[in-house]
UniProtKB/Swiss-Prot annotation:
Stated family: Belongs to the adenosylhomocysteinase family.
Protein name from the UniProt record: Adenosylhomocysteinase
GO molecular function: adenosylhomocysteinase activity
Enzyme Commission designation: 3.13.2.1
Chain positions recorded as NAD(+) binding sites: 196-198, 230, 259-264, 282, 317, 338-340, 383
Pathway assigned in UniProt: Amino-acid biosynthesis; L-homocysteine biosynthesis; L-homocysteine from S-adenosyl-L-homocysteine: step 1/1
Taxonomic classification: Bacteria, Pseudomonadati, Pseudomonadota, Alphaproteobacteria, Hyphomicrobiales
Superkingdom: Bacteria
Function of the protein: May play a key role in the regulation of the intracellular concentration of adenosylhomocysteine.
């Protein structure tokens, strides 16, 4: 008799059937991942890979997880955000016998406990690959090893409420785990593929400091990720989150978007298409000029605070909306964030004010003067906290890149071509990912003749652009 599988923590395993139905629907909308299974499945390039995955536990991620398993990998999974888990997706993955530790609305204590549990491989041993979104799994090992090697002073100097919890976990691990626990993990990891801008910044910082422990592939800066997921994904999912959270009429409202990178561009377009009059703030003169040329009013947050009805942060930086900005806002202004972390808005400065929870991930905060503010997802990702995240089709492109990156680092690095540095996938794979998604939406490519290809100095089959080309 087979032992019952219990290596998971989900809200309700009874949601598995619902999750499986939605996974089936998503597979139809994720041609890149399904083609990857068909092409690479027989070769099993990830056989022997033990992947620790920290990425939003959604229906789309379930398709990614099952693709990795179909290619031979052994996987353990957590969500990279306390509000982004879709409980029926987590249940379906658990019911399939894949370890997953994720509950929508989990506490920060649970979040970090689940991250630690992800690294404790069932049957002994450690993971040998990381698939990360935001860099928390990567930081867990790097900072754990740093403390294990005797540099523990930083553990007594947390810079945020979350670091208080994270550093307490590291102290606990140092006491309870055998000596050399983090060193063993670090030694076994062959590489990490990183999904998002914030995590990529962390990787480049470590590379610059000479502390990066293993090769890393920056999936975020693949064109078929950043110019699609970040832009077109946000264009669809931002307004979905605001509407589900507030039920307000967006048409005619004044909206303020902080940041005009790819996420900001998609966010501004999302609000404009909903009928909002959109303002943008930027520190980069190039992005500011782009916003102005697109017809957006480019202002500062100080200018916008008393004018806008809706505020969205999309910068990847900290303290973008300060307590002073919030005090200057209209009564019941809506404030949310679509960057990876919750520090774009000074949430900590609001903790001593009156909070009224209206419904999950929607809070009304009252200031001493009686003015109120509507805060979505406590300043965390609004499109995943208040809605269902990006559509399956655009996530197929991102996750196909993730799968190819895992194959590169695990199966195609036997000659040691990947050092302890940050890389991007080659242009040929970027174009391959795009090509896999064309038929689904009825795109017919024009083909170059040989003489035309020679004329512009490319191969008939591509790549068609130089690495420095900006799409």
């Amino acid at each position: 008799m087979t032992a019952k599988f219990t290596d998971y923590i989900v809200k309700d395993i009874g949601l598995a059937e619902f999750g499986r139905k939605e996974i089936s629907l998503a597979e139809t909308e994720m041609p890149g991942l399904m083609a990857t299974r068909e092409e690479y499945g027989p070769k099993q390039p990830l056989k022997g890979a033990r992947i620790a995955g920290s990425l939003h536990m959604t229906i789309q991620t379930a398709v990614l997880i099952e693709t990795l398993v179909a290619l031979g990998a052994d996987v353990r999974w957590v969500s990279c955000n306390i509000y982004s888990t879709q409980d029926h997706a987590a249940a379906a993955i658990a019911a399939a016998g894949i370890p997953v530790f994720a509950i929508k609305g989990e506490s920060l204590e649970d979040y970090w406990d689940y991250t630690a549990r992800m690294f404790d491989w069932h049957g002994g041993g450690t993971p040998n690959m990381i698939l990360d979104d935001g860099g928390d799994a990567t930081m867990y090992v790097h900072l754990g090893l740093r403390a294990e090697n005797g540099d523990t002073a930083f553990l007594d100097k947390p810079g945020s409420d979350e670091e208080v919890i994270f550093f307490a976990l590291l102290k606990k691990q140092l006491k309870e785990k055998p000596k050399g626990y983090f060193a063993e993990i670090a030694k076994n990891i062959r590489g990490v593929s990183e999904e998002t801008t914030t995590g990529v910044h962390r990787l480049y910082d470590m590379q610059k400091a000479g502390t990066l422990l293993w090769p890393a592939i920056n999936v975020n800066d693949s064109v078929t990720k950043s110019k699609f997921d970040n832009l077109y994904g946000c264009r669809e999912s931002l307004v979905d989150g605001i509407r589900r959270g507030t039920d307000v009429m967006l048409s005619g409202k004044v909206a303020m978007v902080a940041g005009f990178g790819d996420v900001g561009k998609g966010s501004a377009a999302s609000l404009r298409q909903a009928g909002c009059r959109v303002m943008v703030s930027e520190v980069d003169p190039i992005c500011a000029l782009q916003a102005a040329m697109e017809g957006y009013q480019v202002v500062t947050m100080e200018d916008a605070a008393p004018l806008a009805d809706i505020f969205v942060t999309a910068t990847g930086n900290k303290d973008i909306i300060t307590i002073e900005h919030m005090r200057a806002m209209k009564d019941r202004a809506i404030v949310c964030n679509i960057g990876h972390f919750d520090n774009e808005i000074q949430i900590a400065h609001l903790k001593n004010l009156k909070w009224d929870n209206i419904k999950p991930q929607v809070d009304e905060i009252t200031f001493p003067d009686g003015k109120r503010m509507i805060l979505l997802s406590e300043g965390r990702l609004v499109n995943l906290g208040n809605a269902m995240g990006h559509p399956s089709f655009v996530m197929s492109a991102s996750f196909t890149n993730q799968t190819l990156a895992q194959i590169e680092l695990f199966a195609n690095n036997k000659d040691g071509k990947y050092k302890k540095e940050v890389y991007v996938l080659p242009k040929s794979l970027d174009e391959k990912v795009a090509r896999l998604h064309l038929a689904k939406i009825g795109v017919k490519l024009t083909e170059l003749r040989k003489d035309q290809a020679d004329y512009i100095g490319v191969k008939v089959e591509g790549p068609f652009k130089a690495d420095h080309y900006r799409y």
